[in-house]
């Protein structure tokens, strides 16, 4: 029951690799050029602000004693494995869903790298309106969010619409 990898959704894992490279590179640049919590305004609603998150999205569980590092690392590994199995079971022509899975995997692995190497996820994208700041995030978070939106979008497509999206292969 072995299938050539190029005929499966795993063919799209290159996108996950690109996300990991861009995410880790951008975080390394920020860590090399910013002190922790240093902020540089770029435009009236956006700063580059170096922050660390010991929890998950919106600093969920960030105030715990450290066990959450391994908990979230396990979740990232588990989700990545499940999505890779789903990609293997799909065809390479199912571009939308495979790209979505690859974005989520790339984001999960980018943040996993931070958790394992730095003990926390490094964030630096800071959007705000007046004094209200959206939680600081990074490129891995952007990839995960886009991937999740694409999964939801794909779920609303009819089979005919899915065929039209995936047709040009």
UniProtKB/Swiss-Prot annotation:
Give the matching Pfam families.
Peptidase_A8
An example GO CC term for this entry is: plasma membrane
Identification of the protein by name? Lipoprotein signal peptidase
Family per record: Belongs to the peptidase A8 family.
- Keywords carried by this UniProt record: Aspartyl protease, Cell inner membrane, Cell membrane, Hydrolase, Membrane, Protease, Transmembrane, Transmembrane helix
GO molecular function per UniProt: aspartic-type endopeptidase activity
Query: Where does this protein come from, organism-wise?
Result: Yersinia pseudotuberculosis serotype O:1b (strain IP 31758)
Pathway assigned in UniProt: Protein modification; lipoprotein biosynthesis (signal peptide cleavage)
The protein's matches in InterPro entries, at most eight in alphabetical order, are given as:
Peptidase_A8 (IPR001872)
Could you tell me where this protein is found in the cell? Cell inner membrane
Look up the signal peptide feature and give its range: none
Q: What does this protein do?
A: This protein specifically catalyzes the removal of signal peptides from prolipoproteins.
* EC number, as in UniProt: 3.4.23.36
Q: Which cysteines are joined by disulfide bonds?
A: none
> What parts of the sequence cross the membrane?
4-24, 29-49, 70-90, 101-121, 137-157
- What is the membrane topology noted in the UniProt record heading this document? Multi-pass membrane protein
Could you tell me what reaction this enzyme catalyses? Release of signal peptides from bacterial membrane prolipoproteins. Hydrolyzes -Xaa-Yaa-Zaa-|-(S,diacylglyceryl)Cys-, in which Xaa is hydrophobic (preferably Leu), and Yaa (Ala or Ser) and Zaa (Gly or Ala) have small, neutral side chains
């Amino acid at each position: 029951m072995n299938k050539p990898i190029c005929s499966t959704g795993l063919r799209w894992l290159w996108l996950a690799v690109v996300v990991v490279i861009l995410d880790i590179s951008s975080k390394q640049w920020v860590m090399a050029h910013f002190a922790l919590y240093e902020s540089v305004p770029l435009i009236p609603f956006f700063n580059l602000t170096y922050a660390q998150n010991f929890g998950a999205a919106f600093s969920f569980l960030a105030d715990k004693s450290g066990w959450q590092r391994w908990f979230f690392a396990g979740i990232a590994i588990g989700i990545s494995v499940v999505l890779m199995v789903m990609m293997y079971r799909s065809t390479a022509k199912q571009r939308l869903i495979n790209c979505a899975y690859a974005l989520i995997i790339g984001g999960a692995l980018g943040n996993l790298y931070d958790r394992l190497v730095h003990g926390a996820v490094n964030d630096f994208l800071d959007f705000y309106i007046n004094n209200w700041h959206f939680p600081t995030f990074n490129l891995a978070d952007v990839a995960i969010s886009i991937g999740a939106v694409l999964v939801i979008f794909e779920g609303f497509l009819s089979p005919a619409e899915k065929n039209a999206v995936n047709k040009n292969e």
